[in-house]
Curated annotation (Swiss-Prot):
CDD domains: Peptidase_C15. This is Pyrrolidone-carboxylate peptidase. Removes 5-oxoproline from various penultimate amino acid residues except L-proline. It catalyses: Release of an N-terminal pyroglutamyl group from a polypeptide, the second amino acid generally not being Pro. The active site is at residues 78, 141, 165. GO terms for molecular function: pyroglutamyl-peptidase activity.
Length: 213
């Protein structure tokens, strides 16, 4: 199995992005399965385009995108991506679409196709906090999550895609009081445990992961 894992470059005034830094720490093979790593730009359109080019080149079985969700307390595995760009801030090239469709011919939303609950449980088995998330936001992370799901639906039906959000690093919150963080090695270990669950589970497990609000 080939697993393509992407991480974003820094954005929003940050000097580092734990997404790409944690992806870089992943081994080149997990349980005998090839791990292919790629950095993508925090730019509407170009982020998806770069991934599409890599997919065409390496033909992965799984695509896992990783992004920073500063303020979240744990590793969050996304359930759904929605067909809207509504950017609160500009991307790294100054784009700021508001209430625009990601894919004109796409559905309003896609349920992502990774075993999200198995991933969460395997991360937690390593004593790392994790949960299912029901929103990837409306910035670049959701843009990529939806874009990859749409590529799967329209071009690569046997490919599985999904998205993992991670917290800030400790050095990013020195001037952000009461903001959660997680060290880089722990994030990288969580990603490895998530990937193990993807390898081991063609179907998701039946455990609760929902929220009341």
């Amino acid at each position: 199995m080939k697993i393509l894992v992407s991480g974003f470059d820094p954005f929003g005034g940050e000097k580092i992005n734990p997404a790409i830094e944690s992806v870089k720490l992943l081994p080149d093979s997990i349980k005998g399965n090839e791990i292919i790593k790629i950095e993508i730009p925090t730019v509407i359109g170009k982020s998806v385009d770069k991934l599409k080019e890599k997919i065409k080149e390496v033909k992965p079985d799984v695509v896992i995108s990783v992004g920073q969700a500063g303020g979240r307390e744990d590793i969050t595995v996304e359930r759904v991506a929605i067909n809207v760009d509504d950017c609160r801030i500009k991307d790294n090239e100054g784009n700021q679409p508001i209430d625009e469709k990601i894919a004109e011919d796409g559905p309003d939303a896609y349920l992502l196709t990774l075993p999200i609950k198995a991933m969460v449980e395997n991360i937690k088995s390593a004593n790392i906090p994790a949960s299912v998330s029901n929103t990837a936001g409306t910035f670049i992370c959701n843009h990529v999550a939806y874009g990859m799901a749409h590529v799967r639906a329209t071009e690569y039906p046997n490919m599985r895609t999904g998205f993992i959000h991670i917290p800030f690093l400790p050095e990013q919150v020195l001037n952000k009081p009461h903001t959660a963080s997680m060290n880089l090695d722990t994030i990288a270990k969580a990603l490895e445990k998530a990937i193990e669950a993807v390898i081991d589970n063609d179907e998701d497990i039946k455990v609760t992961g929902g929220k009341t609000h």
